[in-house]
Amino acid sequence: MFQPAPKRCFTIESLVAKDSPLPASRSEDPIRPAALSYANSSPINPFLNGFHSAAAAAAGRGVYSNPDLVFAEAVSHPPNPAVPVHPVPPPHALAAHPLPSSHSPHPLFASQQRDPSTFYPWLIHRYRYLGHRFQGNDTSPESFLLHNALARKPKRIRTAFSPSQLLRLEHAFEKNHYVVGAERKQLAHSLSLTETQVKVWFQNRRTKFKRQKLEEEGSDSQQKKKGTHHINRWRIATKQASPEEIDVTSDD
């Protein structure tokens, strides 16, 4: 059994690698993590032994105060020749030389960045039904995303008719529910409207007329049913027969 290393107090001076007064007996023994001392006492793991030897050599040369140099040299020695380990540059070198924007860390991520349909699985399903609205030879999903807002059919603007125009249109509708051809053209010219505006107004007016007619017929039938129901209840209460049940016979 090996004795555990005594606890050491890490001060700010030791962390920032400033010179601090040390006893003469410990001047040649630099402060290092306890894991390195454990690795030195156990010859089972060759990787830890190699790491410890590299750190000890760096400490003997007096460069242990620079963590970047110790880290680079310790990693640059591969423990196993069959598995090469590339030296890792210090963090400030990585920050000074960032990766280019076009470089992708993995080909899978690059394919997802180039193809927006992978992020929107519903895109292809909608694109099959809306592809006929595009113009040109570009029928890619990117074109769908760019031109989808422009490819929508614009909403029809409702025409604000003046009271005099509405009065003339109502008179024309009372005469004829369908105005076509030269009559519609003449009516539109007299009202300073287009033929399309007159056509749409007559379509809406016919729809309104049919709805009003159905509502009137429905209300009349309900009134008749209510009246018949009250008459039948009165006959049942007074025990009077209906006109169909009365048999009129003459004495002759």
UniProtKB/Swiss-Prot annotation:
UniProt-recorded Gene Ontology molecular function terms: DNA-binding transcription factor activity, RNA polymerase II-specific; RNA polymerase II cis-regulatory region sequence-specific DNA binding; sequence-specific double-stranded DNA binding
Bias type Basic residues, positions: 224-233
GO biological process: anterior/posterior pattern specification; brain development; cell proliferation in forebrain; central nervous system development; cerebral cortex regionalization; dentate gyrus development; forebrain cell migration; neuron differentiation
SMART domains: HOX (SM00389)
Disordered: annotated segments: 212-252
Nucleus listed as a keyword: yes
A GO CC term attached to the entry: nucleus
DNA-binding region per Swiss-Prot/TrEMBL record: 154-213
Disulfide bonds: none
Entries under PROSITE patterns matching the protein: HOMEOBOX_1, HOMEOBOX_2
UniProt note on tissues of expression: Cerebral cortex.
Keywords: Cell projection, Developmental protein, DNA-binding, Homeobox, Nucleus
Subcellular localization, as worded in the UniProt entry: Nucleus; Cell projection, Axon
InterPro entries reported for this sequence: EMX-VAX-Noto_Homeobox_TFs, HD, HD_metazoa, Homeobox_CS, Homeodomain-like_sf, HTH_motif
Function: Transcription factor, which in cooperation with EMX1, acts to generate the boundary between the roof and archipallium in the developing brain. May function in combination with OTX1/2 to specify cell fates in the developing central nervous system. In the inner ear, it controls the distribution of GPR156 at hair cell boundaries, and regulates the organization of stereociliary bundles in opposite orientations across the line of polarity reversal (LPR).
Quaternary context: Interacts with translation initiation factor EIF4E.
Similarity annotation: Belongs to the EMX homeobox family.
Disease cited in the entry: Schizencephaly: Extremely rare human congenital disorder characterized by a full-thickness cleft within the cerebral hemispheres. These clefts are lined with gray matter and most commonly involve the parasylvian regions. Large portions of the cerebral hemispheres may be absent and replaced by cerebro-spinal fluid.
Full protein name: Homeobox protein EMX2
Classification lineage: Eukaryota, Metazoa, Chordata, Craniata, Vertebrata
Gene (UniProt): EMX2
